[in-house]
Amino acid sequence: MKNINWKEEIIDFLKTLLVSFLVIFLFTKFIAKPVRVNQNSMYPTVLDQSVGITNIFSVEVLHDINRFDIVVVQTDDGKNLIKRVVGLPNDTISFKNDVLYVNGLPMEQPFLDEAYVNEEKAKYGLFTNDIEEITLGPDEIYCLGDNRPYSKDSREYGPFRESQVIGKGIFLLYPFNRFGGVE
């Protein structure tokens, strides 16, 4: 029978634990952060109570934010919101009769679920209330939830500063039937 050196075993275990914590810390500090959805504002794209991770590397290092990206923004009161970017710095945006206008040009929104939009239009007449023309500043973005009738977004909070974006995109881990990246 082999004699177990408990001191070495404990030291090996503590080393493994320390390395694991270090890897997790570095991963969540520089690459991706966990996110949990506590709202229906992105339905049906992302369901309430979904859990995933968001890419912070693209935002922190590459400063890569594009129109129609899904982002995680932090409000001034510290809430994290998952929204879609519809307006970029210096854009002029508006909504009229459910049409998004960017710099005066109508924009398609292919990411919206057409059946769901039509269902909500039948209930409320519009899916997205009209938004008066707004011109964004050099570091501002305008974000909306995909579930426009139920979303608290830039229409309520105003434009977000690019520095308020803490992650780009979401890779869903739960629910398991939606496992994978979200567009």
Regions found by a protein language model. Give the residues of each.
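Soluble "head" domains of membrane/secretory-pathway proteins
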Residues: K2-I10, L26, P44-E183
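Aromatic-capped interface at the extracytoplasmic side
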Residues: L26-M42
